[in-house]
Amino acid sequence: MDNKVLVKELITVSILHRCHIMTDASQTGLYFGQPMMLEYILSHPDCTQRELAKALNISPASAATSLGRIEKSGFIARRQDEADSRKNRLSVTESGLKALEAFRAVCDTTDTQLLSGFGEDEREQLFSFLQRLHENLAQNISREDLRKTIKSGGKR
């Protein structure tokens, strides 16, 4: 089989997966990139905007824009740092936690649909194939190049 056919199918599956999640997740009030931010804030309570941006490999300006939208939706709260009034500490609100839980449920449903009809042996075999694909590509790229690509949204 031609490499291009295989790679095109792999990319198509990835796009369909993302499309299903983002379409179904729209009812949660969360949009692309926001769940990742909420997950980080939830696991790093009282983090700063700068810490969040650094951890997610995004610019502070991008973080500020996204956090503004998330805050407007009522999913996070900002609290001024007691030691440094220039910093704001971030926390997930109760409604943010509910939205995140709903988003996780959407992901679980989509993942179940994606892998329906696959037996345990097939899942293990698929995992093995995906690990090999990962290794094939990872060996020729530096961590810094990967970080830059992620930060630029894939644009070079």
Name these PLM-found stretches.
Residues 121-156:
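C-terminal regulatory/oligomerization modules of transcriptional regulators
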Residues 68-131, 135:
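Charged, amphipathic alpha-helical coiled-coil/dimerization segments
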Residues 3-4, 59-60, 88-92, 145-156:
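Membrane-interacting alpha-helical segments
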